[in-house]
Regions:
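Glycine-rich, basic loop-to-helix element that forms the pyrophosphate-binding segment
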Residues: 66-84
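Short aromatic/hydrophobic "clamp" motif used to bind/position activated sugar donors
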Residues: 89
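Short beta-strand-to-loop element that shapes/binds the nucleotide-sugar donor at the catalytic cleft/hinge
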Residues: 118-140
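C-terminal catalytic/acceptor-binding lobe
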Residues: 192, 196-313
């Protein structure tokens, strides 16, 4: 089994030709082997292409989300996670780059931290956003120099190529697969561009990390990562990324245009408000678990009598669990089998778990 599954979501359109180019570059550059598998997940595309054959010819995994009517990064990530063979996941956007040297460091940290077994262990990666000039200038150098070139530009603040720095990439996290699935992955109510990664990251931090001190006014948004006060959710999000900085591990985000094709950018404000709503209720905000691929579509009825249960961890592997008290199917102290059968058909139940006391 591979140590790491890297999930790369993408969707093509004529307005964004660079996406196809970057998918091809990644499929050629990365090598799937016994330590790492690369999973390219295509969401909605409005442009025809032959990338499936190209990706598979380079010995990577290709998946297609046939249900998407509009492109969703979150849905692509969720599908990739369900199908991943490794117990550890990393999500990498098609615009982002990690060097092979840094992948080697990540693989070593995965083993040292035992992320495959420790569901609360994380690696949060910092990201350097590059300007338009960097897209062409970097290609004049051998890729083995890219890490040093970009980091030097960042550290001495030349900003020849660096647009800005974020201490945490909220979308590129190394996480235990079971934990990701039991937390429900990306909330698919976020439509189009923005904030599904913030929403997930907040739930991950709540579940996996205990902080001695939390920022004041968590709902405050500094709107950038250049803050000087421990205030707002960005200061909370930034805390874990510095560890990877000390190891010299960075993600580089290449510049791209942002056309609003297929209304992809249109819902950003709505997504922003949905994120704030969830953030204000962070202690209670919860999603149903996702399932591994072989359990997708399974619906399990958990019938109990005196005690309700929470089988989130089991749900990941057996299917979506619906909890019902057996008394709901009684009338005048008599079990009405027709009520139970109607419920099974209506909810399309495929399995039943019974409380031992029934």
């Amino acid at each position: 089994m591979a140590l790491l599954s890297v999930i790369i979501p993408f969707g093509l359109s004529k307005e964004r030709p660079y996406i196809e180019e970057r998918v091809i570059e990644k499929a050629k550059y990365f090598k799937s082997d016994e330590n790492i598998e690369f999973i390219f997940v295509e969401g909605y595309s409005s442009k025809n292409h032959e990338l499936k054959n190209f990706i598979q010819a380079n010995h990577h995994i290709y998946l297609k989300d046939m249900e998407q009517k509009a492109f969703s990064q979150g849905k692509c990530r969720n599908l990739g996670a369900s199908c991943a063979h490794s117990n550890v996941l990393l999500f990498l956007d098609v615009d982002c780059y990690i060097s092979l040297d840094n992948f080697e460091k990540i693989l070593k940290l995965i083993q040292i931290k035992n992320i495959a077994q420790n569901i609360n262990a994380l690696i949060v990666l910092p990201v350097v956003y590059l300007n338009k000039e960097a897209n062409e200038k970097l290609k004049q150098y051998d890729e083995e120099f890219w890490d040093i070139l970009i980091q030097e530009d960042l550290f001495i603040a030349k900003n020849t190529w660096v647009k800005f720095f974020s201490p945490s990439s909220t979308s590129s996290i190394v996480i235990n697969k079971h934990q990701f699935l039991r937390l429900g992955g990306n909330d698919e109510n976020f439509i189009g561009h923005g904030y599904e990664d913030f929403d997930l990251f907040a739930r991950i931090l709540k579940a996996c990390v205990s902080f001695e001190k939390m920022p004041t006014n968590l709902s405050y948004d500094a709107r950038n990562w250049n803050f000087f006060n421990f205030k707002g959710f960005r200061s909370w999000f930034s805390l874990l990324g510095y560890e990877a900085c000390f190891y010299g591990i960075y993600i580089y985000h290449f510049y791209h245009i942002e056309p609003n094709q297929n209304a992809y950018m249109q819902n950003k404000d709505k997504n922003h408000q949905l994120f704030y709503k969830h953030l204000k209720n962070i202690k209670k905000h919860d999603l149903k678990p996702l399932q591994v691929f072989k359990a997708k579509g399974e619906k399990v009825l958990m019938l109990f009598k005196d005690q309700n249960y929470d089988f989130k961890d089991i749900s990941v592997y057996v299917g979506e669990i619906i909890y019902k008290n057996i008394s709901d199917f009684f009338i005048a102290k008599e079990l009405k089998y027709e009520l139970l059968l109607d419920f099974l058909q209506q909810e399309k139940i495929t399995k039943i778990f019974l409380d031992a006391s029934i």
